[in-house]
């Protein structure tokens, strides 16, 4: 597996903390060089040995096995290669720095090297404010480039002018030289100087040689370098000019020998040889004194070779070619691009320990298993270190060798030496030593990462457990294919084997499939039941599906963890039958409740629609995709949230196995018969299609006879098309519906559609009824040639069949024309998909690169690698998206009256409350005050919701902790009866709730910002809690008692804390994936608005690209203009505003323009106009009369369109007035009145006084001039409206608003939508509601309303695009993207122009795009990269500071010292003590005394590496796999006294692995009698213990550390307590009383049973052989046959005993579990002595005086 074996390096490895960029100085190049290269040849004369001083000089390192390196003396494998150098005869420009060289030249005086400006210039001081050196250089350059002279201080001729010390001179102190303007031409720089005062002279122009530039740069002073943003230490400007060229070692430009004689050299070697030759030519010419132009030519050649050696893709330069004509691969080409060094070899590499093959489905594997072919299992290995615990196993594997499956391939000794077992003669005899490593084959149960490309989201790589199987494909469970987006038509997938325990731990704890069931993308499951299991489970759960006894018995075999009890049959006579629902109920875990009403009906549901599951029993409903699919709030989601990932996995496995077994015997197949509808239906279909054709024909007739009215905002053609499409789609749907109704329910296609496993209504209608209209580019099939679609049809045929309507079904078959049209539509789909894949792939990459380093920090904020705050709280609530789900705010939908009825309590008037309560609270004014206060708060909450948070009345929002479910669970667990009054007081409820709210912390801290953020984050959840736990609801609706209420409070707090996002979570990448993944599902095309088809809106991928690129000019810019309420309600008023806004130019209303020669201004040659011209001049006007002679004889005549004038509500005087306004006195205008036959405007030019009318020469110009005026008038004279807004459409929008009584109602309002944008002016139009008006170009919003408005506009636009096709992405991902784009105060595009202009590290930027340019820039400004980002650490091969790498581990050295003493090498390896299976309830591994060394029991992964070990943590198929690890096992030292998780199935709906541990001192648990998570006085031998009793919990109130069966997980036991110590005198592993071999304790003794829930090896009264014993039987009692835990007559000590009775006491008469003075935290509580208290200062597990056995 491993490539070349390098000998281990002796160099100590350290972490790269930062990377400094810079330019190599000539001195450095010479000093690190080992050889001066002078000859272009590689080999000496013999052709066998490398030539000294040649390009393969032996000092540079060897690439030949025969030679050793002359510098370091190593062989080819170990010599890293050494640099040489070439001394250039003349300096040359470095091509990467050429533009920078030009900039610097323009900043300094080219004569004395001084900066052209200094601090006397105010602009200069501004430039020095830039922190970033690159920006500073640009700023200085902008100021300097215009200065054309170097200012002097004192004139150079004066006596005290000091040449040696320029800074001593006053003023600027320059040299006064004129500065050239510099032009770059190819690889050369030209300077041109202005010649003195005489402007007529041409400027002097000459070439600036690199040598001159080099000289200037050496003169620049240190201060000036700093001002210029250059770095004196790492990147002086004179080093940008190459004087010495480094020669890379041969190992980076290896040559290949062809047939032993000739060698093929690398491109770089060829290039270097060209440089050496050119260099020699320049040197020769110089020595010979050749003419200047020849030397210059050779210098240019040298410059060209050096430039193309580095970059062979210079614009405007010929490429350097190989002899074959292939361009050479330059250094730049090696680095850039996808295949280049950075992206191809550093950011992503090919890896070892991976396998790839085809995948196949296997429903019998567990959800997280992966079937691996045996050949792969024998090839891939895992290095396991030899320890006392596995030495025998590993020895066995070594014995098996590399060819037998569970074997081993290599042994690695502690010296690092590898033994290959394939070639070792007696491999089996090698004795293993501790500390050696064995590379063993992978075997069942190993975890691996499985992946399918393209990896679009984190569920594309998940952890699986392997199972080695025969044959050559990977096998995986069907349900896991959906997140991978895999199918079994030949897909291949990759498997990666982790190579360290740390990696395996991360895979197990973070990436395992069950943990990925619910995705953060849309907070819903990504896996559900699919395919045949889904079709089967629907059939299986139908009401009329019965099973016989035999069938049920066989099925029971497949039910996981079946307890051996059959559910009672539903039918007893004539024969015993069970239903499928009963069997499914066995698989659903107990404690799961689900309700879904499809149609609001009574509970006795005749149609069996909807779904009701109570306590894991299906009451009614058919199980289909809605229930067991990957749906929000479905069964999978509920089980995962309530019971944890492992149980959820068990549910998947169980349902698949049971249903597939049943389906195997029941059968389900589909044939062509299932698509055939009956004859009547076919007649109906034919009739429907005929009718549609008739309607279309009618439509065509209407259009041809001009009877069709165009719809608003559409042309006639568009209206016609829209109408035809409507008719045809209607026809297809109707035909399909009739076909669907005719198919029976037993029809197999219909069954699949009903189950949701495959197919939809449209598939049925296309197969059986009619395929329907084919669409290309959103329209019907267009006319391709000569006005028709195909030669089969007449010209201009618009009939359905000609334009692509297919009236046949797939069953009947398509005609050739139909087939052709169908192929057209299909082809479009394929092309679309192909184009879309490339586009979205690039979008995804850009998103990830823009957000890869955004992470949740340990202070709860979201920051990027530079530590800039992006969000104060992740998603503004600081929660993990996987752990939130949609919840409804009850108070929002109620009317004010209903609200009052539900929440208000008035003790004086309403007496009903007291009926529900034990204690009377009537007439208690303090209680009433509390209640009033609560009600005021609830009203305020409701106000806030209605006004600000959900003004549209949508009452659903994703929130943590499903409160409703917790209440339901409580009602079940505590068996609360509706009739019993409660012992809760209103004050208890209100105080309990307030305490809970105070504990919901996401941020700890008391400063103002923290408090604000904390309050904002939890506000919605607080409102939800207050509305759910209002006093009236708790007492009257849920009827909770005190215990239940306190349990609920504790549960809510615990679950809320789990829902808080983990620090180190890489939320940026998650957000990028959550947006990129739906983008791949998006359709590329833009769609039309329904109804108004000319209102085109860009959607889908093109719109997403516009948003991410922050495009200035978007395809369809549009404003949504909302109107004032009174206008929005009235169509006519809205129409007025529309005309106000729509931009109307003169050309819009003009129907014709003419130019006439009409010399007499007072009369006219045009007959039509005579009347109004005469009428105009009939009334004399002195001013007009005076100026008559100035009027031009040429006349411009405009004719206006009356219909348009009326539509736009314009009058003639309006139009003429605008013209006059525009031209003022230069144009003379007269016009006809508004009701004349024709609307005419006549214009003449008024000439200046000096141009008299007789001047004929100007006549010619005048008509031409008039023509230009005409064009100008039509376009630029704006009659009314807002510029840029070309069209305005009126739309009716549905809005939701709150009305008087507090409910929400739907209403319509008129809204204007525009083509074109101009937000500023549109907002000022009268009647426009400026607060709601919106532009879809957020670039415009940024300019007008600022960055915060832009952020919400951006969010809205993103939402529109993603939710258009029904995807849902959780708010926090979109919000994070918007915040990243706007957090810098300007819009950062998700392109190289945005991402690469941020201040992130150079390495990170160069891994995105513009690789070489960024590295050059970094070098030139001497940047430093602090390696905080993700990309940098990936390149350097280091653990990046993210996730599990975001923190360090703090190790308690002393504890370690004490601990290691007890480790004894186990002797009983594998003596029959396998991992015992305990029932979920038993938290204690009862079968061993705490002092025995645990030996080989239980796999380490069972005791998960944290104090949270608890029932069912790591089991297979939902059993608890208890790692029974004894005293000295390394996994047990972590149990601190306050840390026992109370979760286990006896009590709480238990949370599985992710549960935080409650501390016993949590007030929410203190007074519950049945819930003493860690009270230290319970003994399992006490007669009151019963596994099924409601008050029993493995962690229950009476557990005693001194009892013989006391276990290591007990809170008071801690290995660090001094009295327990392997060296303490009272403990001895060999003492006779504690020995595995002692007679009283033996694993094989008849009294030992690891599965018994209450087994204690020393209890005399318990025996598994006792006749009445059955652990699951409710009436089981170890001592008495009549014992029943719930019967009041049972009593261990007294006749009146009842477990909840206040006088019941295990130890003393005055002890009462519910009495307020009893609490594990109360100081007076003590199990053994009055002075004991867990929180008292004297109690501490590590305190020397504390001992579990000492009395105090």
From Swiss-Prot:
The domain-related comment in the record is: The C-terminal domain (CTD) serves as a platform for assembly of factors that regulate transcription initiation, elongation, termination and mRNA processing.
List the subcellular locations: Nucleus
Described function: DNA-dependent RNA polymerase catalyzes the transcription of DNA into RNA using the four ribonucleoside triphosphates as substrates. Largest and catalytic component of RNA polymerase II which synthesizes mRNA precursors and many functional non-coding RNAs. Forms the polymerase active center together with the second largest subunit. Pol II is the central component of the basal RNA polymerase II transcription machinery. It is composed of mobile elements that move relative to each other.
The opening ranks of the lineage are:
Eukaryota, Fungi, Dikarya, Ascomycota, Taphrinomycotina
State a single Gene Ontology molecular function: chromatin-protein adaptor activity
- EC number(s) reported in the record: 2.7.7.6
UniProt protein name? DNA-directed RNA polymerase II subunit rpb1
Positions binding Mg(2+) 2 in this chain are 487, 489
């Amino acid at each position: 597996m491993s490539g070349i074996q390098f000998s281990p390096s002796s160099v100590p490895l350290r972490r790269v903390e930062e990377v400094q960029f810079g330019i190599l100085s000539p001195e450095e190049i010479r000093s690190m060089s080992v050889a001066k290269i002078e000859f272009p040849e590689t080999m000496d004369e013999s052709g066998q040995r490398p030539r000294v001083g040649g390009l393969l000089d032996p000092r540079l390192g060897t690439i030949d096995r025969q030679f050793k390196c002359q510098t370091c003396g190593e062989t080819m494998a170990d010599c890293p290669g050494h640099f040489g150098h070439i001394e250039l005869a003349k300096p040359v420009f470095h091509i990467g720095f050429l533009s920078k060289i030009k900039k610097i030249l323009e900043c300094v005086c080219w004569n004395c090297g001084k900066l052209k400006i200094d601090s006397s210039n105010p602009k200069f001081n501004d430039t020095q404010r830039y922190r970033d050196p690159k920006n500073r250089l640009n700023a200085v350059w902008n100021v300097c480039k215009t200065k054309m002279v170097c200012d002097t201080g004192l004139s150079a001729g004066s006596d005290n002018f000091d040449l040696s010390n320029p800074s001593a001179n006053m003023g600027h102190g320059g040299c006064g030289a004129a500065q050239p303007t510099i032009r770059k031409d190819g690889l050369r720089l030209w300077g041109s100087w202005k010649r003195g005062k005489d402007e007529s002279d041409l400027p002097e122009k000459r070439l600036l040689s690199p040598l001159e530039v080099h000289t200037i740069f050496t003169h620049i002073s240190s201060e000036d370098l700093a001002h210029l943003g250059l770095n004196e230490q790492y990147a002086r400007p004179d080093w940008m000019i190459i004087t010495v060229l480094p020669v890379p070692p041969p190992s980076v430009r290896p040559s290949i020998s062809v047939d032993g004689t000739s060698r093929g050299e690398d491109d770089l070697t060829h290039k270097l040889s060209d440089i050496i030759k050119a260099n020699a030519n320049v040197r020769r010419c110089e020595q010979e004194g050749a003419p200047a132009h020849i030397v210059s030519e050779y210098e240019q050649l040298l410059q060209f070779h050096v430039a193309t050696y580095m970059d062979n893709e210079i614009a405007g330069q010929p490429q350097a070619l190989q002899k074959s004509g292939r361009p050479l691969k330059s250094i730049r080409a090696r680095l850039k691009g996808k295949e280049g060094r950075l992206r191809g070899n550093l950011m992503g590499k090919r890896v070892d320990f991976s396998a790839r093959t085809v995948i196949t489905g296997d429903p019998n594997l567990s959800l997280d298993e992966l079937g691996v072919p045996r050949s792969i299992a024998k090839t891939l290995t895992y290095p396991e270190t030899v320890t006392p615990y596995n030495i025998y196993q590993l020895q066995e594997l070594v014995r098996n060798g590399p060819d037998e499956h569970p074997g081993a391939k290599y042994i690695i000794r502690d010296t690092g030496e590898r033994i290959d077992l394939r070639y070792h003669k007696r491999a089996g005899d090698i004795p293993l030593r501790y500390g050696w490593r064995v590379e063993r084959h992978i075997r069942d149960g190993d975890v691996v990462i499985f992946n399918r490309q393209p990896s679009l989201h984190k569920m594309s790589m998940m952890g699986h457990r392997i199972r080695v199987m025969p044959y050559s494909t990977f096998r995986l469970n069907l349900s896991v294919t959906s997140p991978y987006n895999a199918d079994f038509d030949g897909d291949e997938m990759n498997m990666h084997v982790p190579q360290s325990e740390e990696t395996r731990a991360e895979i197990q704890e973070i990436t395992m499939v069950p943990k990925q069931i619910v995705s953060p993308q849309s907070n819903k499951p990504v896996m559900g039941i699919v395919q045949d299991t889904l079709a089967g489970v629907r059939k299986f759960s139908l009401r009329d599906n019965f099973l016989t006894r035999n069938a049920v018995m066989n099925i029971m075999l497949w039910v996981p963890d079946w307890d051996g009890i059959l559910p009672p049959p539903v039918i007893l006579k004539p024969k015993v039958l069970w239903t499928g629902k009963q069997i499914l109920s066995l698989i659903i875990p107990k404690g799961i409740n689900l309700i879904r009403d499809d149609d609001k009906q009574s509970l006795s549901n005749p149609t069996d629609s909807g779904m009701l599951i109570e306590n894991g029993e299906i009451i009614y409903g058919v199980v289909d995709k809605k229930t067991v699919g990957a749906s929000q709030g479905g069964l999978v989601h509920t089980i995962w949230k309530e019971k944890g990932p492992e149980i959820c996995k068990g549910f998947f496995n169980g349902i698949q196995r049971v249903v597939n077994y049943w389906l195997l015997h029941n059968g389900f197949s589909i044939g062509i018969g299932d698509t055939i509808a009956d004859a009547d239906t076919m007649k109906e279909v034919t009739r429907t299609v005929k009718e549609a054709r008739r309607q279309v024909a009618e439509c065509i007739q209407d259009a041809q006879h001009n009877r069709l009215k165009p719809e608003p905002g559409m042309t006639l053609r568009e209206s016609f098309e829209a109408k035809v499409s409507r008719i045809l789609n209607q026809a297809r749907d109707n035909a399909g519906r009739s076909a669907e109704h005719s198919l029976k329910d037993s029809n197999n296609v219909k069954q699949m559609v009903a189950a949701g496993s495959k197919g939809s209504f449209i598939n049925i209608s296309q197969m059986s009824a009619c395929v329907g209209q084919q669409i290309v580019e959103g329209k019907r099939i267009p006319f391709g040639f000569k006005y028709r679609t195909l030669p089969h049809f007449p010209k201009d045929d618009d009939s359905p069949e000609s334009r692509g309507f297919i009236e046949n079904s797939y069953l009947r078959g398509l005609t050739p024309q139909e087939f052709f049209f169908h192929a057209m539509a299909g082809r479009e789909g394929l092309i679309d998909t192909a184009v879309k894949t490339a586009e979205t792939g690039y979008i995804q990459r850009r998103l990830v690169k823009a957000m890869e380093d955004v992470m949740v920090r340990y202070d709860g904020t979201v920051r990027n690698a530079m530590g800039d705050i992006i969000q104060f709280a992740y998603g503004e609530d600081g929660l993990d998206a996987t752990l939130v789900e949609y919840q409804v705010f009850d108070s929002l939908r109620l009317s004010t009256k209903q609200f009052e009825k539900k929440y208000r309590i008035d003790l004086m008037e309403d007496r009903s409350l007291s009926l529900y309560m034990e204690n009377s609270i009537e007439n208690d004014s303090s209680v009433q005050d509390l209640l009033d206060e609560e009600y005021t708060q609830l009203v305020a909450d409701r106000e806030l919701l209605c006004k600000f948070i959900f003004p549209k009345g949508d009452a659903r929002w994703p929130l943590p902790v499903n409160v409703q479910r917790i209440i339901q669970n409580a009602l079940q667990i505590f068996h609360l009866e509706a009739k019993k009054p409660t012992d809760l007081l209103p004050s208890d409820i209100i105080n309990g709730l307030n305490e809970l709210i105070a504990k919901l912390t996401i941020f700890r801290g008391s400063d103002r910002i923290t408090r604000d953020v904390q309050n904002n984050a939890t506000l919605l959840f607080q409102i939800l809690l207050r509305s759910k736990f209002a006093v009236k609801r708790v007492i009257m609706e849920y009827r909770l008692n005190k215990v239940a209420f306190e349990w609920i409070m504790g549960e809510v707090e615990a679950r809320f804390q789990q829902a808080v996002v983990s620090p180190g979570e890489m939320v940026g990448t998650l957000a990028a994936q959550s947006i990129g993944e739906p983008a791949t599902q998006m359709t590329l095309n833009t769609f039309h608005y329904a109804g108004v088809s000319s209102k085109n809106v860009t959607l889908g991928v093109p719109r997403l690209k516009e948003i991410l690129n922050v495009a200035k000019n978007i395809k369809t810019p549009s404003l949504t203009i909302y109107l004032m309420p009174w206008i929005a309600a009235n169509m006519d008023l809205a129409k007025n505003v529309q005309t106000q806004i729509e931009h109307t130019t003169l050309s819009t209303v003009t129907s014709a323009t003419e130019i006439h020669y009409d010399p007499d201004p007072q009369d006219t040659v045009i007959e039509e106009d005579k009347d109004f011209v005469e009428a105009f001049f009939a009334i004399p006007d002195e001013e007009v009369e005076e100026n008559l002679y100035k009027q031009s004889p040429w006349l411009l005549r405009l004719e206006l369109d009356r219909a348009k004038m009326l539509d736009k509500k314009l009058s003639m005087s309006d139009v003429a007035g605008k013209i006059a306004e525009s031209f003022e006195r230069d144009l003379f205008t007269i016009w006809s009145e508004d009701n004349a036959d024709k609307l005419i405007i006549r214009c003449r030019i008024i000439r200046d006084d000096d141009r008299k009318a007789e001047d004929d020469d100007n006549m010619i110009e005048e008509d031409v001039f008039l023509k230009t005026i005409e064009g100008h008038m039509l376009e630029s004279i704006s009659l009314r409206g807002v510029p840029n807004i070309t069209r305005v459409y009126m739309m009716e929008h549905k809005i939701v608003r709150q009305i008087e009584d507090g409910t929400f109602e739907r209403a319509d309002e008129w809204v204007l939508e525009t083509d074109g944008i101009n937000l500023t002016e549109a907002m000022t139009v009268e009647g426009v509601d400026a607060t709601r008006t919106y532009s879809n170009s957020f670039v415009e919003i940024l300019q007008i309303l600022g960055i915060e408005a832009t952020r919400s506009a951006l969010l809205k636009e993103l939402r529109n695009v993603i939710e258009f096709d029904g995807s849902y992405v959780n708010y926090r991902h979109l919000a994070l993207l918007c915040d990243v784009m706007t957090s810098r105060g300007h819009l950062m595009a998700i392109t190289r122009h945005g991402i690469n202009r941020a201040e992130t590290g150079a390495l990170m930027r160069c891994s995105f795009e513009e690789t070489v340019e960024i590295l050059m820039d970094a070098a030139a400004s001497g940047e430093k990269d602090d390696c905080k980002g993700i990309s940098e650490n990936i390149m350097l091969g280091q653990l990046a500071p993210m996730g599990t790498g975001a923190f360090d581990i703090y190790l308690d050295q002393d504890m370690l010292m004490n601990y290691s003493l007890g480790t004894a090498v186990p002797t009983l390896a594998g003596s029959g003590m396998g991992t015992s299976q305990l029932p979920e309830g038993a938290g204690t591994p009862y079968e061993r005394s705490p002092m025995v060394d645990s030996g080989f029991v239980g796999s380490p992964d069972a005791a998960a590496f944290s104090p949270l070990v608890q029932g069912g943590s790591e089991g297979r198929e939902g059993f608890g796999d208890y790692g029974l690890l004894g005293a000295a096992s390394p996994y047990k030292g972590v149990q601190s006294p306050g840390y026992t998780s109370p979760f286990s199935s006896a009590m709480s709906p238990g949370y599985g692995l992710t549960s935080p541990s409650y501390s016993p001192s949590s007030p929410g648990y203190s007074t519950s009698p049945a819930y003493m998570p860690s009270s230290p006085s319970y003994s399992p031998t006490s007669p009151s213990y019963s596994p099924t009793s409601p008050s029993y919990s493995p962690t229950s109130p009476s557990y005693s550390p001194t009892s013989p069966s006391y276990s290591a997980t007990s809170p008071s036991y801690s290995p660090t307590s001094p009295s327990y110590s392997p060296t303490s005198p009272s403990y001895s592993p060999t003492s006779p009383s504690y020995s595995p071999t002692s007679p009283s304790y033996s694993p094989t003794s008849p009294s030992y049973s690891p599965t018994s829930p209450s087994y204690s090896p020393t209890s005399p009264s318990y025996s598994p052989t006792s006749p009445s014993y059955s652990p699951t039987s409710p009436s089981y009692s170890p001592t008495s046959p009549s014992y029943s835990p719930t019967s009041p007559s049972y009593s261990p000590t007294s006749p009146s005993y009842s477990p909840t009775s206040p006088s019941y006491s295990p130890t003393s008469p005055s002890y009462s579990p519910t009495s307020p003075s009893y609490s594990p935290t109360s100081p007076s509580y003590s199990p053994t002595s009055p002075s004991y208290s867990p929180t008292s200062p004297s109690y501490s597990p590590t305190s020397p005086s504390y001992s579990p056995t000492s009395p105090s």
